[in-house]
C-alpha cells in the first residue's frame, strides 16, 4: 500500500498554561505595553498637582525638573 503522506506531519501539543500560549502572548505584548504606558502617563498627569509627587519624583528629572520648581515670590503665596 502506498502512503499518501510520505513525510507525515508531526502533530504535537503546543505548550500552554490554561489558554495562554507563547504565540498568543507575543501578539498581546505590544497592545498591553501601549495600554500600560497610557495608564502611567494618565497617573502622572493627575499626580502632577500633588506637592509630594512634584518634589520627590518630578523635580529630580534632568531636563524637565526645572519646570516643576516653585518660582512664585513669597509675597504672592497666600497658602
Curated annotation (Swiss-Prot):
Residues 1-23 are mitochondrial matrix. Residues 48-79 are mitochondrial intermembrane. It is a single-pass membrane protein. GO terms for cellular component: mitochondrial inner membrane; mitochondrion; respiratory chain complex III. It comes from Schizosaccharomyces pombe (strain 972 / ATCC 24843). InterPro entries: Cytochrome_b-c1_su10_fun. The keyword rRNA-binding does not apply. GO terms for biological process: mitochondrial electron transport, ubiquinol to cytochrome c; proton transmembrane transport. This is Cytochrome b-c1 complex subunit 10. Coiled coil: none annotated. Component of the ubiquinol-cytochrome c oxidoreductase (cytochrome b-c1 complex, complex III, CIII), a multisubunit enzyme composed of 3 respiratory subunits cytochrome b, cytochrome c1 and Rieske protein, 2 core protein subunits, and additional low-molecular weight protein subunits. The complex exists as an obligatory dimer and forms supercomplexes (SCs) in the inner mitochondrial membrane with cytochrome c oxidase (complex IV, CIV). The gene is qcr10. It is found in: Mitochondrion inner membrane. Component of the ubiquinol-cytochrome c oxidoreductase, a multisubunit transmembrane complex that is part of the mitochondrial electron transport chain which drives oxidative phosphorylation. Its main location: mitochondrion. Keywords: Electron transport, Membrane, Mitochondrion, Mitochondrion inner membrane, Respiratory chain, Transmembrane, Transmembrane helix, Transport. Belongs to the UQCR11/QCR10 family. The chain crosses the membrane at residues 24-47.
Amino acid at each position: 500500500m502506498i502512503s499518501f503522506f510520505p513525510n507525515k506531519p508531526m502533530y504535537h501539543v503546543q505548550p500552554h498554561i490554561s489558554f495562554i500560549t507563547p504565540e498568543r502572548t507575543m501578539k498581546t505584548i505590544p497592545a498591553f505595553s501601549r495600554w500600560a504606558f497610557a495608564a502611567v502617563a494618565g497617573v502622572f498627569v493627575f499626580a502632577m498637582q500633588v506637592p509630594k509627587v512634584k518634589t520627590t519624583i518630578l523635580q529630580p528629572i534632568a531636563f524637565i525638573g526645572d519646570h516643576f520648581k516653585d518660582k512664585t515670590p513669597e509675597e504672592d503665596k497666600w497658602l
